[in-house]
């Protein structure tokens, strides 16, 4: 099966301030990943990282899906996001409360950010799973206020909030669970037993996670062929209208 990897980052060297797109593409080849959503969470600046991802997606439109990292603390965030989305390349944005040290409830620009994503048909990916700033429940009010915007919980609540994340996704048809970095089989078993199969998106977490391990963990769950097809390909294709 040709996999769609919903979550990865572009490798970056702080010492040389360079990105390693070749390593990312080789990893895709090694793991039968046909399409990969990529963001540049680590970069000298947010703008430089996003521009690099934009250019990478332009060079490899059949392999790379672009996700823009957004820092909602910045005073020009709405204008900046408007300019990015008007390029027509970015399929998603990534909001990381741990990386940028914020609580969603304190960021008054987020309503406009969600509005813009809804207007452009762009998905909002949010980092969850490690510490109080990354609680999945902090995003539910924004989802309720913006009924045209889809939300993805990256790492599916992680080690801190995995069980609670399942409960938050259950009543909504606009919240999805992305799987990278979550290897706790009891949480995964509960999630697959409780949630509709179309709510799951496979993510590798590359390069901080090993792509093969992110794929092989699902061998332990004894998923049906239809569940695997949905997880590894069909759900991302439907969400992103590929």
Language model feature labels by segment:
Residues 4-11, 127, 155:
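Histidine-centered divalent metal-coordination motifs
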Residues 1-6, 18-35, 197-199, 212-242:
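Mid-to-C-terminal alpha-helical segments outside catalytic/metal-binding sites
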Residues 7, 28, 53, 84, ...:
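Conserved, mostly hydrophobic/aromatic
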Residues 47-123, 171:
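Active-site gating/metal-coordination segments in enzymes
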Residues 18-39, 51-59, 82-86:
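Alpha-helical scaffold segments that flank or form the walls of functional sites
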Residues 8-9, 22-44, 64-71, 91-92, ...:
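Divalent metal-dependent hydrolysis catalytic cores, especially in the metallo-beta-lactamase
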Residues 91, 104-201:
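Catalytic pocket-lining loop regions of alpha/beta-barrel enzymes
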Residues 12-19, 40-48, 70-77, 100-107, ...:
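Acidic-and-aromatic substrate-binding clefts and catalytic sites of carbohydrate-active enzymes
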